[in-house]
């Protein structure tokens, strides 16, 4: 019965493809919040310094005293007093272990909800012409709008580019596919090797299979839980 319900939610073409590829499962949970877990995370600075966010409240990285990090209510917020034009774009890593979850507010105001067993590589300040982060695992993004500086999520063999929107990406390294689900706005997905692109609209999900680099788009129901 569960299989019938799942297949009814996707198009005939996608159904036929996945019927021939049963090793890849299609997640039907519309996830706009992290899965239940405990608020556990570690922050690894570019310098190699590691901070357990369960223990620390407010602090500054050793390599940049102009940046302030506020850590409260299971949320790490980055505040920079340094203009982006003079900042250096060194990448830090927020690590959420298995069974944990955490929220990150980036320097531009964008919010990222990290799920269990997830890593996000990000700069303290977006100094270049693009806002680029790297994701391993699953996260829900609420991207602050900036028409002059697109926001790009690099994951696996693909990249997702937006100006301001809400979307979820599931890209665990052990999975055979990357799932990008759009809640609002629009996103452009690009397969890096072939440069093939696809445009997502609200209530659509892109399934990118890592073994062949193919992208398929189908409609999803945002009320499914």
For the regions a protein language model found, what residue spans apply to each?
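A residue-level detector for the "anchor" residue at the start of short, highly conserved motifs
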Residues: 1, 10-225
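Conserved beta/loop motifs at nucleotide-recognition and modification sites
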Residues: 6
